[in-house]
Amino acid sequence: MFVKSLVFLTIAVAYASADCLHCICMRESGCKPIGCNMDVGSLSCGYYQIKLPYYEDCGQPTKKSGETTEAAWKRCANDLSCATTCVENYYNRYKSQCAGTGQGACEVMARNHNGGPQGCKHSGTLGYWNGIKSCCGCS
C-alpha cells in the first residue's frame, strides 16, 4: 500500500509541476517561441522570457562546446524542452531559500521565476503568483 501511495504522490506532483510550468509559459509568452524582448532594462528571451543571468544560474543546459553563453541562452530559451529544463533547474537550485515559508512548490517556482532566487519572499511577486494560481489551481 505504501508503494502505491508513493507512486500516486509522485505522479500527482509531476502533473502539478507540468500544470505550473505550462501556466508560467502561457503567462510569459502564450507558450510560443517569441524571441527576445527588452524587459526591465535587459533582454528576456523565449517561451519563459529567460534572462541571461537566469540561464547561467540554471546550469546552461544544452550549451555546446565552443558556443558563446549568449548564443546558447537564446537558442535554449526558444526551445521548449531546453527552456523548461532551465526553469526546473532554477527552481531546484533555489527552492531551499523558500523553506519555512509555507508555500507550495508551484508558488515557489512561479515567484522565484518572476523575482529571482528569493522571489518567494518579495511581495512584488504576489501578483504574478496570483495569475499563475488562477491558471492552474496550483499551490
UniProtKB/Swiss-Prot annotation:
From the UniProt record, list the reaction(s) this protein catalyses. Answer: Hydrolysis of (1->4)-beta-linkages between N-acetylmuramic acid and N-acetyl-D-glucosamine residues in a peptidoglycan and between N-acetyl-D-glucosamine residues in chitodextrins
Q: Does the UniProt entry include the keyword Secreted?
A: yes
Tissues expressed in: Expressed in pharynx grinder muscle pm7, isthmus marginal cell mc2 and pharyngeal muscle cell pm5, intestinal cells and at lower levels in coelomocytes and epidermis. Expressed at low levels in intestine.
Q: What happens when the gene is disrupted?
A: Slight reduction in brood size. 24 percent reduction in lifespan which is further reduced upon M.nematophilum CBX102 bacterial infection. Impaired food digestion characterized by the accumulation of unlysed E.coli in the intestine. Accumulation of unlysed bacteria is stronger upon M.nematophilum CBX102 infection.
Cellular compartment(s): Late endosome lumen; Recycling endosome lumen; Lysosome lumen; Secreted
Q: Which cysteines are joined by disulfide bonds?
A: 20-106, 23-138, 25-31, 36-45, 58-86, 76-82, 98-120
Q: Which family does the UniProt entry place this protein in?
A: Belongs to the glycosyl hydrolase 22 family. Type-I lysozyme subfamily.
Protein's UniProt name: Invertebrate-type lysozyme 3
